[in-house]
C-alpha cells in the first residue's frame, strides 16, 4: 500500500520539519496540533518556530496544496507521532501526550495504516502505544496480537537532528527503524525513504528506543566530564578552555566544551528515562545528570562573587548594581528555551539580586513566563552600556561578534569562554 496521505501529530521543532519534508516530495500531508495559533500560522504558509530554511519549505508546501494543518486528526495512510515526552517532578517519564495522541488517531485508523512513534520515550513505550490503540479499536488487529498479519503496522523511529540544522540532517542522517515486526520495519523504512537520503537501519522497537536514549546519555556523560573539569580548573586557577585545547591535541582525546549546564528536550531529559527504569544500574548516567544539573548553581555562586567584588571596588549599593545575562536558549543561534540552564541561571540571579537583572536573547521577542516580572529584556548594546556585571550563558554568533573594546566591565562570568 502506498502512502498517499501522511499525518504528523505534533507540529513542533521535529514534527513540523518532518511534515514539511514529506510535503516537499509532493505527498499530501496533514499536520495535527492542539495549538490553534500554530495551525493558523502554518496554514498561512508561515512558521511559529525558528529553524533555518524551514519557512521556505513550509511556504512552498502550503501554497502548493501539499501541507495542511488541523487541530483534530483526519484519515491518513501513515501517522507519525512527534509530541513532547517530558519527565515528572520525580524524573519519571510522562507519557500523557503520547497516550493522548494515540487515542486521538484511533477513531480514524483503518486496515493497512502505519503508526510510527518518533517521540523520545522509555523502553517499552511503542508496545504501550500499541496497547492503547488496541484497546480503543478492538475491531482492528495489532502486531502484539497478530504479528505479521496485523491490520495496523507499528514502529518506533527516533529523530537524530541538531536544532539549527534540522532541514539538512533530517534528510541526510541515517535513521534507526524499530518495527514491532519485520513487516512493520519494512513499511516504516519505505515511508522514510520518501525523503531520506541516509540509510534506514532496521532493528526492533525496544532496541530503537534504547538507542535514542543511549545516544543522548553518551553526550550527557561527556558534557558532565567537561563541566566537572571546569569546576576543578576554577578551584586550581587554570583556564579550562586552554586546558581542553591542549588535551585535545592528543590524537585519542576529544573533550567537549563546558557550559552553564545542559538543556534542551533531549540531552537534559533522556538520561532520566534510563535512570528511572534502571536505578541500581545506571550509576554513571545518574551521576552525570547530577553534575550537569548542578552546574547552574555553581554559575550563580560565581555571579554572587562577582557582585561582591563590584561592591567592594565601587561606591555603589547592591540595588544599584545591574547584572546582564547573555543568552537564554539551550544552545547557540536558536529560539528553543526548553530545559535551558541559562533560563534557570537568569531566574536564580534575578530572585537573589536586589538590583536590576537584564537579559539579552536576540532569538526571542518576549520573555518566558518563568522570567516575566523578574528580568528586563534588552538588546546587546544597551546591556553592555548599562550593566556592571556580565554573565555569558549562550555563545550566540551575535555575542561572539562583540568587539573586545566594547566591553568595559571588569566583572565578567563567562561560562562559554567567549570573552576569555
From Swiss-Prot:
<feature type="binding site" description="in chain A">
    <location>
        <position position="160"/>
    </location>
    <ligand>
        <name>UDP-N-acetyl-alpha-D-mannosaminouronate</name>
    </ligand>
</feature>
<feature type="binding site" description="in chain A">
    <location>
        <position position="219"/>
    </location>
    <ligand>
        <name>UDP-N-acetyl-alpha-D-mannosaminouronate</name>
    </ligand>
</feature>
<feature type="binding site" description="in chain A">
    <location>
        <position position="161"/>
    </location>
    <ligand>
        <name>UDP-N-acetyl-alpha-D-mannosaminouronate</name>
    </ligand>
</feature>
<dbReference type="GO" id="GO:0051287">
    <property type="term" value="F:NAD binding"/>
</dbReference>
<feature type="binding site" description="in chain A">
    <location>
        <position position="212"/>
    </location>
    <ligand>
        <name>UDP-N-acetyl-alpha-D-mannosaminouronate</name>
    </ligand>
</feature>
<comment type="pathway">
    <text>Bacterial outer membrane biogenesis; enterobacterial common antigen biosynthesis.</text>
</comment>
<dbReference type="GO" id="GO:0016628">
    <property type="term" value="F:oxidoreductase activity, acting on the CH-CH group of donors, NAD or NADP as acceptor"/>
</dbReference>
<feature type="binding site" description="in chain A">
    <location>
        <position position="263"/>
    </location>
    <ligand>
        <name>UDP-N-acetyl-alpha-D-mannosaminouronate</name>
    </ligand>
</feature>
<dbReference type="InterPro" id="IPR001732">
    <property type="entry name" value="UDP-Glc/GDP-Man_DH_N"/>
</dbReference>
<feature type="binding site" description="in chain A">
    <location>
        <position position="330"/>
    </location>
    <ligand>
        <name>UDP-N-acetyl-alpha-D-mannosaminouronate</name>
    </ligand>
</feature>
<dbReference type="InterPro" id="IPR036220">
    <property type="entry name" value="UDP-Glc/GDP-Man_DH_C_sf"/>
</dbReference>
<dbReference type="InterPro" id="IPR014027">
    <property type="entry name" value="UDP-Glc/GDP-Man_DH_C"/>
</dbReference>
<feature type="binding site" description="in chain B">
    <location>
        <position position="338"/>
    </location>
    <ligand>
        <name>NAD(+)</name>
    </ligand>
</feature>
<feature type="binding site" description="in chain A">
    <location>
        <position position="33"/>
    </location>
    <ligand>
        <name>NAD(+)</name>
    </ligand>
</feature>
<dbReference type="Pfam" id="PF03720">
    <property type="entry name" value="UDPG_MGDP_dh_C"/>
</dbReference>
<dbReference type="Pfam" id="PF00984">
    <property type="entry name" value="UDPG_MGDP_dh"/>
</dbReference>
<dbReference type="InterPro" id="IPR028359">
    <property type="entry name" value="UDP_ManNAc/GlcNAc_DH"/>
</dbReference>
<dbReference type="GO" id="GO:0009246">
    <property type="term" value="P:enterobacterial common antigen biosynthetic process"/>
</dbReference>
<feature type="binding site" description="in chain A">
    <location>
        <position position="126"/>
    </location>
    <ligand>
        <name>NAD(+)</name>
    </ligand>
</feature>
<dbReference type="Pfam" id="PF03721">
    <property type="entry name" value="UDPG_MGDP_dh_N"/>
</dbReference>
<comment type="similarity">
    <text>Belongs to the UDP-glucose/GDP-mannose dehydrogenase family. WecC subfamily.</text>
</comment>
<dbReference type="InterPro" id="IPR017476">
    <property type="entry name" value="UDP-Glc/GDP-Man"/>
</dbReference>
<comment type="function">
    <text>Catalyzes the four-electron oxidation of UDP-N-acetyl-D-mannosamine (UDP-ManNAc), reducing NAD(+) and releasing UDP-N-acetylmannosaminuronic acid (UDP-ManNAcA).</text>
</comment>
<feature type="active site" description="Nucleophile">
    <location>
        <position position="266"/>
    </location>
</feature>
<dbReference type="GO" id="GO:0089714">
    <property type="term" value="F:UDP-N-acetyl-D-mannosamine dehydrogenase activity"/>
</dbReference>
<dbReference type="InterPro" id="IPR008927">
    <property type="entry name" value="6-PGluconate_DH-like_C_sf"/>
</dbReference>
<feature type="binding site" description="in chain B">
    <location>
        <position position="250"/>
    </location>
    <ligand>
        <name>UDP-N-acetyl-alpha-D-mannosaminouronate</name>
    </ligand>
</feature>
<dbReference type="InterPro" id="IPR014026">
    <property type="entry name" value="UDP-Glc/GDP-Man_DH_dimer"/>
</dbReference>
<comment type="subunit">
    <text>Homodimer.</text>
</comment>
<keyword id="KW-0520">NAD</keyword>
<dbReference type="InterPro" id="IPR036291">
    <property type="entry name" value="NAD(P)-bd_dom_sf"/>
</dbReference>
<feature type="binding site" description="in chain A">
    <location>
        <position position="14"/>
    </location>
    <ligand>
        <name>NAD(+)</name>
    </ligand>
</feature>
<feature type="binding site" description="in chain A">
    <location>
        <position position="416"/>
    </location>
    <ligand>
        <name>UDP-N-acetyl-alpha-D-mannosaminouronate</name>
    </ligand>
</feature>
<dbReference type="InterPro" id="IPR032891">
    <property type="entry name" value="WecC"/>
</dbReference>
<feature type="active site" description="Proton donor/acceptor">
    <location>
        <position position="212"/>
    </location>
</feature>
<feature type="binding site" description="in chain A">
    <location>
        <position position="331"/>
    </location>
    <ligand>
        <name>UDP-N-acetyl-alpha-D-mannosaminouronate</name>
    </ligand>
</feature>
<protein>
    <recommendedName>
        <fullName>UDP-N-acetyl-D-mannosamine dehydrogenase</fullName>
        <ecNumber>1.1.1.336</ecNumber>
    </recommendedName>
</protein>
<feature type="binding site" description="in chain A">
    <location>
        <position position="216"/>
    </location>
    <ligand>
        <name>UDP-N-acetyl-alpha-D-mannosaminouronate</name>
    </ligand>
</feature>
<feature type="binding site" description="in chain A">
    <location>
        <position position="85"/>
    </location>
    <ligand>
        <name>NAD(+)</name>
    </ligand>
</feature>
<feature type="binding site" description="in chain A">
    <location>
        <position position="13"/>
    </location>
    <ligand>
        <name>NAD(+)</name>
    </ligand>
</feature>
<feature type="binding site" description="in chain B">
    <location>
        <position position="252"/>
    </location>
    <ligand>
        <name>UDP-N-acetyl-alpha-D-mannosaminouronate</name>
    </ligand>
</feature>
<keyword id="KW-0560">Oxidoreductase</keyword>
Amino acid at each position: 500500500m502506498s502512502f498517499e496521505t501522511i499525518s504528523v501529530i505534533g507540529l513542533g521543532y521535529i514534527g513540523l520539519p518532518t511534515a514539511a519534508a514529506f510535503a516537499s516530495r509532493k505527498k499530501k500531508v496533514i499536520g495535527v496540533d492542539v495549538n490553534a495559533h500554530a495551525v493558523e500560522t502554518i496554514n498561512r504558509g508561515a512558521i511559529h518556530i525558528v529553524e533555518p530554511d524551514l519557512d521556505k519549505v513550509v511556504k512552498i508546501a502550503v501554497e502548493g496544496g501539499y501541507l495542511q494543518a488541523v487541530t483534530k486528526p483526519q484519515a491518513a495512510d501513515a501517522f507519525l507521532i512527534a509530541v513532547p515526552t517530558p519527565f515528572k517532578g520525580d524524573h519519571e517519564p510522562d507519557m500523557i501526550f503520547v497516550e493522548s495522541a494515540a487515542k486521538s488517531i484511533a477513531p480514524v485508523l483503518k486496515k493497512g495504516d502505519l503508526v510510527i512513534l518518533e517521540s523520545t520515550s522509555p523502553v517499552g513505550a511503542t508496545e504501550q502505544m500499541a496497547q492503547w490503540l488496541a484497546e480503543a479499536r478492538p475491531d482492528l488487529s495489532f502486531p502484539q496480537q497478530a504479528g505479521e498479519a496485523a491490520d495496523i503496522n507499528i514502529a518506533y523511529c527516533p529523530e537524530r537532528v541538531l536544532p539549527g540544522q534540522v532541514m539538512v540532517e533530517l534528510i541526510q542522517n541515517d535513521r534507526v527503524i524499530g518495527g514491532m515486526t519485520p513487516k512493520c520495519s519494512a513499511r516504516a523504512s519505505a515511508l522514510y525513504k520518501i525523503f531520506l537520503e541516509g540509510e534506514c537501519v532496521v532493528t526492533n522497537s525496544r532496541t530503537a528506543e534504547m538507542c535514542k536514549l543511549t545516544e543522548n546519555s553518551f553526550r550527557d556523560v561527556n558534557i558532565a566530564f567537561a563541566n566537572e573539569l571546569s569546576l576543578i580548573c576554577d578551584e586550581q586557577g587554570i583556564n579550562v578552555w586552554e586546558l581542553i585545547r591542549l588535551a585535545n591535541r592528543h590524537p585519542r582525546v576529544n573533550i567537549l566544551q563546558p557550559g552553564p549546564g545542559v538543556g534542551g528536550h533531549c540531552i537534559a531529559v533522556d538520561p532520566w528515562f534510563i535512570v528511572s527504569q534502571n536505578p541500581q544500574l545506571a550509576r554513571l548516567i545518574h551521576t552525570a545528570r547530577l553534575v550537569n544539573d548542578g552546574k547552574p548553581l555553581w554559575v550563580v555562586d560565581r555571579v554572587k562573587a562577582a557582585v561582591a567584588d563590584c561592591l567592594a571596588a565601587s561606591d555603589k549599593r547592591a540595588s544599584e548594581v545591574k547584572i546582564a545575562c547573555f543568552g537564554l536558549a539551550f544552545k547557540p543561534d536558536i529560539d528553543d528555551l526548553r530545559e535551558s540552564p541559562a533560563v534557570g541561571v537568569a531566574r536564580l540571579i534575578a530572585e537573589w539580586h536586589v538590583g536590576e537583572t537584564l537579559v539579552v536573547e536576540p532569538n526571542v521577542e518576549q520573555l518566558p513566563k518563568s522570567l516575566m516580572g523578574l528580568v528586563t529584556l534588552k538588546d546587546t548594546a544597551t546591556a553592555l552600556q548599562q550593566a556592571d556585571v556580565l554573565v555569558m550563558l549562550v555563545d550566540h554568533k551575535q555575542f561572539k561578534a562583540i568587539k573586545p573594546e566594547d566591553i568595559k566591565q571588569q566583572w565578567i562570568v563567562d561560562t562559554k569562554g567567549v570573552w576569555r
